[in-house]
Regions:
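Substrate-binding pocket helix/loop in short-chain dehydrogenase/reductase
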Residues: 98-99, 106-111
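Active-site helix of classical SDR
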Residues: 122, 158
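Conserved glycine-rich cofactor-binding loop
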Residues: 7, 14-16
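Residue(s) in the substrate-gating loop at a strand-loop-helix junction
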Residues: 142
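The beta1-alpha1 cofactor-binding region of Rossmann-like NAD(H)/NADP(H)-dependent oxidoreductases
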Residues: 40-41, 61-73, 104
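Conserved glycine-rich Rossmann-like NAD(P)H-binding loop of the short-chain dehydrogenase/reductase
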Residues: 28-45
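Active-site loop immediately N-terminal to the catalytic Tyr-X3-Lys motif
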Residues: 100, 147-153
Length: 158
């Protein structure tokens, strides 16, 4: 297995693309930390699927949009695992609305999760990756960042 002994943190891993990334990393031998902010049941389902296939995983709740909570999550994971080899910044949300109808909270929620969340995770893991002399950071994005969609000004900007 290509990733045997590696520790991988996947944000937004309870469903969609993040779920599939988590399953694929586990299949390649990585210990997978399934980060989620919404449904604990869906995150535990991903963990269960990984462990039933012989892998190792755990679910960790944290809104990556929150700077302090993201820092706390990273410190806790490093204390327990001693390293993080792979960070996949996948967490993302949408709050679609035409710009003229969009309120500031809808705009901010998307930017805080999709853009600031990526910053928060990289900020709080980068020193550890330098200390361990290695690591991989993978940032997932959307084609919507290149080709905008009506009603998604916030999402496209993020």
């Amino acid at each position: 297995m290509l990733l045997e002994g590696k520790i991988a943190l996947v944000t937004g891993a309870s469903r969609g693309i993040g779920r599939q990334i988590a399953l694929t990393l586990a299949k390649e031998g990585a210990v997978v930390i399934v980060n989620y902010n919404g449904s604990a049941a869906k995150a535990e389902e991903v963990v269960r699927e990984i462990t039933e296939a012989g892998g190792t995983a755990e679910a960790v709740q944290c809104s990556v949009s929150d700077y302090a909570k993201t820092e706390e999550m990273m410190k806790d994971l490093i204390a327990r695992y001693k390293r993080i080899d792979i960070l996949v910044n996948n967490a993302g949300i949408t709050k679609d609305n035409l710009l003229m109808k969009m309120n500031e909270e809808e705009y901010d929620a998307v930017l805080d999760t999709n853009l600031k969340g990526t910053f928060n995770c990289i900020k709080h893991i980068s020193r550890q990756m330098l200390k361990q002399k290695g690591g991989r950071i993978i940032n997932i994005s959307s084609v919507s960042g290149v080709m905008g969609n009506a009603g998604q000004a916030n999402y496209c900007a993020s």
